[in-house]
Amino acid sequence: MQTYGNPDVTYGWWAGNAGVTNKSGKFIAAHIAHTGLIAFAAGGSTLWELARYNPEIPMGHQSSIFLAHLASIGIGFDEAGAWTGAGVASIAIVHLVLSMVYGAGGLLHSVLFVGDMQDSEVPQARKFKLEWDNPDNQTFILGHHLLFFGVACIWFVEWARIHGIYDPAIGAVRQVEYNLNLTSIWNHQFDFLAIDSLEDVLGGHAFLAFLEITGGAFHIATKQVGEYTKFKGAGLLSAEAILSFSCAGLGWMAVVAAFWCAQNTTVYPEAWYGEALILKFGIAPYWIDSVDLSGGPAFFGHTTRAALANVHYYFGFFFLQGHLWHALRAMGFDFKRILKEPLPAQLYE
C-alpha cells in the first residue's frame, strides 16, 4: 500500500488486508478466512430464512434473498414441481461445515505456514509470491483467478443443462441448453436488461467460460514482451493500484447487477424476488416497489428485489469512490496534505 516514503508504516486492525500487503502467505490466509465468513453467512442466513418462510405468502414478499437464489437455480422443489424447500437445509448445513474448514485453513496458513510464499520450501508455492510492481508475477496470479471464474461458469452451464433451472415462462424447473450464437451474445451486451431467453443467458456464460479459461491460460503462460517501461505502468503498478482496479471492477458489476435485478424478471423471477421495480431519482437514483407491502412480513415493507437492487447500487457507488481514492493514492497523492497545508490565500478573498 502507499506509504509515502515511510519504511516503518504500521496498520491498525481496521486496515484489513493492508497489514498483509507484502506477506503473501498471510494474504492467502486472509482470503481463506474471508471465504469461511462468506460460507458461514450464506449457511446461517439460509437456515434463518427457511425457518421463517411462510408458503402462504409469495417468497419475494418475505425478504428471502438466499432462498430466492436457490429457487432460481432449481433447488428446493418437490417431485410435483412445487417449491417446498426440499434439500435447502442440507445445503445450508454443508456451508456451515465448510465455513469451519475454511476457518481452520485460514488459521493454518496464518499460524503454521510461512508468512511469505517466497520463503516456502515448495517450488510451486514460491511462484505465488507477491511482487506488486512485477507484471510477470501479477499476470501469473491473474491467470489463475481467471481459470477459477471460467470453471465456475462451466459449472453453472452444466448444472442448467443436466439438472435444470427455474424458467418463469413456464413456472417450472427445466433443463436448458445454451445458445452459443455469437451475434446474439454480442447484441445482448446492449439490451441485457430485456433478455428473456434462458438459452441466451447460458450461452453468454458458456462464452465467458471460454474467454476466461483462454485468458487465464494466456496470462499464466506468457510474460511481458519487451522492456517494462513507464508507458506500460512501471512505477505505477502497486498493491494500492491493483486494489483500485479491484474496487472499480466490483463497483461496475454491482451497478450492472442492480439495474438487471430491478428490471429483468427472467433471471430474477417475480415468483422468488417480487415484482419489477420503478426507478426514481432523488439525491441519487433508487428503486421502489411497484406493489404495496407495508402490511406484509418483508423487512421495511420492501420486496427481495428492492433490497437487492438498492443495496447493490449503493455498494457499487461506494466501491467506485474507493477506486478513485486508492487510484489517486497509488499515483502519489497524499490526502493528508489537504489538512496539513493551508489553502491558497485567494480562496479567502
UniProtKB/Swiss-Prot annotation:
Keywords assigned: Chlorophyll, Chromophore, Membrane, Photosynthesis, Photosystem I, Photosystem II, Thylakoid, Transmembrane, Transmembrane helix
GO cellular component: photosystem I; photosystem II; plasma membrane-derived thylakoid membrane
Molecular-function annotations in GO: chlorophyll binding
Cofactor dependence: divinyl chlorophyll a; divinyl chlorophyll b
Gene Ontology process terms (BP): photosynthetic electron transport chain
Recorded topology in the membrane: Multi-pass membrane protein
Name this protein carries in UniProt: Divinyl chlorophyll a/b light-harvesting protein PcbE
Self-association and partners: The antenna complex consists of divinyl chlorophylls (a and b) and divinyl chlorophyll a/b binding proteins and binds more divinyl chlorophyll b than does the antenna complex from high-light-adapted Prochlorococcus.
Additional note from the record: This low-light-adapted strain contains 7 pcb genes.
Organism: Prochlorococcus marinus (strain NATL2A)
Residue stretches spanning the membrane: 27-47, 65-85, 88-108, 201-221, 241-261, 308-328
Chief localization: membrane
Function: The antenna complex functions as a light receptor, it captures and delivers excitation energy to photosystems II and I. The Prochlorales pcb genes are not related to higher plant LHCs.
Family membership noted in the UniProt record: Belongs to the PsbB/PsbC family. IsiA/Pcb subfamily.
Compartments, record wording: Cellular thylakoid membrane
